[in-house]
């Protein structure tokens, strides 16, 4: 079940317009929700950091079923700024970016992109058809729970294509969402406090010599 905060998404993933006719109280409530959500996800990501001792070497534990993300080095985090694909290729980078999008109420964009990546790898015609329908009902159709912001013409084309699903059913929509994230959310992510903290090299403290 989607939370109330998640359903209150801004589909084009742009800053909320404070001039909208919803009143100052509604806007204040939205901003409070956003701050709470961001704090929650920053806490979760910090937990991943604290439970990852050595970059590049995952911690193993028989009792732990939760995937542990490895703390990136500052050098690795800096690579994410070189290209959007560098960020998406990093498991921790992807987790951090998803948290950022969730704080902006537009996590559906990265979820749709990831669903399309999985869809394109599907070989079975039966599974392809089933996944196509699920992606359509989750992200494309009107009033979908995670509806993405694409034009009506593209939506209509997808509705026709999924009748006989192929791996290219969502190509146009995926490119649209990728471009939206790359040109809109990605630059703001690079300017975020959380990302800047990851890029900082740890300060080396020296203990005073005993006399």
Swiss-Prot record:
GO MF annotation: an example: beta-tubulin binding
Necessary for membrane association: annotated span: 32-66
Keyword Lyase carried by entry: no
Origin: domain of life: Eukaryota
Keywords linked to the UniProt accession: Cell cycle, Cell membrane, Cytoplasm, GTPase activation, Membrane, Nucleus, Phosphoprotein, Signal transduction inhibitor, Translation regulation
Assembly information from the UniProt record: Interacts with GNAQ. Does not interact with GNAI1 and GNAI3. Interacts with EIF2B5. Interacts with PRKG1 (isoform alpha).
Official protein name in the record: Regulator of G-protein signaling 2
Lineage start: Eukaryota, Metazoa, Chordata, Craniata, Vertebrata
Gene: Rgs2
């Amino acid at each position: 079940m989607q939370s109330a905060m998640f359903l209150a998404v801004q589909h084009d993933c742009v800053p909320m317009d404070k001039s909208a006719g919803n009143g100052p109280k509604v806007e204040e409530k939205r901003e409070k929700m956003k701050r709470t959500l961001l704090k929650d996800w920053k806490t979760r990501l910090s937990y991943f950091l604290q439970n990852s001792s050595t970059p590049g070497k995952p911690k193993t534990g028989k009792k732990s079923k939760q995937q542990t993300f490895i703390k990136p080095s500052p050098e690795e985090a800096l690579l994410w700024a070189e290209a959007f694909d560098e960020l998406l290729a990093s498991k921790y980078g992807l987790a951090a970016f998803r948290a950022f999008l969730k704080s902006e109420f537009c996590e559906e964009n990265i979820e749709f992109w990831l669903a399309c990546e999985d869809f394109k790898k599907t070989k079975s015609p039966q599974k392809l058809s089933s996944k196509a329908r699920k992606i359509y009902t989750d992200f494309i159709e009107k009033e979908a729970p995670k509806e993405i912001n694409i034009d009506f013409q593209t939506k209509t084309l997808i509705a026709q294509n999924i009748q006989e699903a192929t791996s290219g059913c969502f190509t146009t929509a995926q490119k649209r969402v990728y471009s939206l994230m790359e040109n809109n959310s990605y630059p703001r992510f690079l300017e975020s406090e959380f990302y800047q903290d990851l890029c900082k090299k740890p300060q080396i403290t020296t203990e005073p010599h005993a006399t």
